Amino acid sequence: MSAIPAEESDQLLIRPLGAGQEVGRSCIILEFKGRKIMLDCGIHPGLEGMDALPYIDLIDPAEIDLLLISHFHLDHCGALPWFLQKTSFKGRTFMTHATKAIYRWLLSDYVKVSNISADDMLYTETDLEESMDKIETINFHEVKEVAGIKFWCYHAGHVLGAAMFMIEIAGVKLLYTGDFSRQEDRHLMAAEIPNIKPDILIIESTYGTHIHEKREEREARFCNTVHDIVNRGGRGLIPVFALGRAQELLLILDEYWQNHPELHDIPIYYASSLAKKCMAVYQTYVNAMNDKIRKQININNPFVFKHISNLKSMDHFDDIGPSVVMASPGMMQSGLSRELFESWCTDKRNGVIIAGYCVEGTLAKHIMSEPEEITTMSGQKLPLKMSVDYISFSAHTDYQQTSEFIRALKPPHVILVHGEQNEMARLKAALIREYEDNDEVHIEVHNPRNTEAVTLNFRGEKLAKVMGFLADKKPEQGQRVSGILVKRNFNYHILSPCDLSNYTDLAMSTVKQTQAIPYTGPFNLLYYQLQKLTGDVEELEIQEKPALKVFKNITVIQEPGMVVLEWLANPSNDMYADTVTTVILEVQSNPKIRKGAVQKVSKKLEMHVYSKRLEIMLQDIFGEDCVSVKDGSILSVTVDGKTANINLETRTVECEEGSEDDESLREMVELAAQRLYEALTPVH
């Protein structure tokens, strides 16, 4: 049994190459109807070089039609320059405008602060720059189509420009949330709930079954912790990524400092080589933020801070007395946040506040277990005496938000990604419990490991739209409509051949077939043999040469020493032409047919003889009173009030008005007339 072509298969396949039972290197492959889509292309923050990549070697990048990036965090877009510049990928790449603007600077910073050799670097600043030309942008709610894949995006909250993508292939809809948050904060709106129900939901599970504390409580705890650190004369370190949660925390701190004059002498630094560029981007894209920010921008730009200074590097930092420094990167693997941590960790007055999610294998995750000492980047051991607090401002959904989101959409299939193995397992169990007694909603929950595929079957109805000339008249029940079936991507249309050029790139062509066959016998012998075969033979003259029209579509022309067949090529005409050819070859090659040939002596039968005999014959069949002659060339037969008229010249029979439905009378009279004509035709 031959394999079903990918385009016709009902199998939909989802395979995580990253973020399968882990957080980091998000990269999900979707395959359906011969199309392949990559959702995100990130790196693992806890790994380096090629080890940080998703399992790209399991796919052929050249087969990917479309790549969609949900937001600018490294674990979602960090491998993109490598994928665009160092692989055979030739598809199209999309992200939102804000994501593209920030991606450029965030990855530039990643290249600069990565603490690995040039040989191990995945890509250079040049690769990053060149990748920008290959990235296209999409507006929220704007519908685009690539290779028959329709897609559009919704606000996801989480960070500026973050998007959830709705993808539609052959009528099957899939929603990929990326990272999302259903809670509005100081500058971002909550993730939207799409008004279209997806068949499949690929959703993050970062926090599993945890419930976040209330925003007000969390902000108060954060501000109080910072206040306590500077009150005791310490330095407060808040490791963050240059963009994202950093802007939320800056808004909180700036407002808190404004309301506490006693803190005005204590500096707050935003320490990132990207500080200025990042803030310029945030000041540009206020329209992608929530209503509160959009209203405030008319009075003043909330991202022009009064109590916060930018700090480009340690060279510009005067480390005297208490201060608060927000430094990147967020997991302290390298860069400014790592330098400051190593120089401050031995003083118990100092404190570090981990404000976001931390991946396994990073320093930030390690110090949350409060070890007695840490290892510096140079390999030295240092005692850890500074306070360590974890106050999560990570804009990911908690169980309550995730559960409500799923309840609103009711997708038949939920695929969990972007979550540590145990958290994901707990979330899966909780979701299954939630719906196990619900007879109305049936939801299957999947949590695939990296490289493990989830296979689903979607058998959609194939509907064909009738368009153009064929659609001009409303069809009646039972009417047969025939045309050309045109498939474009996953849409079917039935068109008249004359409409092909209007609705498609196709043009209607006709092929005229001409075939010459050697023939030396009498031409009227051919007429006789073909008449015996079909009865549908018409005698013609074409350019003063004898000719026959057989089956209404095949022309046979007599030429010296041969006959020429002409017809318009199509399956039925080709079959008729083969039949006529067989008769000609048989007559030409079989002497017996020629010897016993019965030739027509007269092309025309005496009309008055035929008329009289036919009248007698029909009177015998139907009765004397039923048959009458009209104006010499037409005989009428009337039976039970139904009348059929015979044209003696053409031997065609037509029923009079009111008798049209009596097909059996017409056929009987026509058959009698034809048989009598053939019997009376003079032969010798």
From Swiss-Prot:
Keywords, comma-separated and alphabetical: Acetylation, Endonuclease, Hydrolase, Isopeptide bond, Metal-binding, mRNA processing, Nuclease, Nucleus, Phosphoprotein, Ribonucleoprotein, RNA-binding, Ubl conjugation, Zinc
Keyword Acetylation: yes
Subcellular location per the Swiss-Prot or TrEMBL entry: Nucleus
GO biological process: mRNA 3'-end processing; mRNA 3'-end processing by stem-loop binding and cleavage; positive regulation of G1/S transition of mitotic cell cycle
InterPro entries (alphabetical): Beta_Casp, CPSF73-100_C, MBL, Metallo-B-lactamas, RibonucZ/Hydroxyglut_hydro, RMMBL
Record-listed E.C. numbers: 3.1.27.-
EC class name: hydrolase
GO cellular component: mRNA cleavage and polyadenylation specificity factor complex; ribonucleoprotein complex
Keyword Secreted: no
Modified sites of kind N-acetylserine: 2
Modifications the protein undergoes after translation, according to the UniProt entry: Sumoylated on Lys-462, Lys-465 and Lys-545, preferentially by SUMO3.
A GO molecular-function descriptor: RNA binding
Annotated active site: 396 (proton donor)
Modified sites of kind Phosphoserine: 659
Phosphothreonine: modified positions: 681
Function statement: Component of the cleavage and polyadenylation specificity factor (CPSF) complex that plays a key role in pre-mRNA 3'-end formation, recognizing the AAUAAA signal sequence and interacting with poly(A) polymerase and other factors to bring about cleavage and poly(A) addition. Has endonuclease activity, and functions as an mRNA 3'-end-processing endonuclease. Also involved in the histone 3'-end pre-mRNA processing.
Subunit annotation: Component of the cleavage and polyadenylation specificity factor (CPSF) complex, composed of CPSF1, CPSF2, CPSF3, CPSF4 and FIP1L1. Interacts with CPSF2, CSTF2 and SYMPK. Interacts with TUT1; the interaction is direct and mediates the recruitment of the CPSF complex on the 3'UTR of pre-mRNAs. Interacts with WDR33. Interacts with ZC3H3.
Name of the protein in its database record: Cleavage and polyadenylation specificity factor subunit 3
Naturally occurring in which organism (per UniProt): Bos taurus (Bovine)
Gene: CPSF3
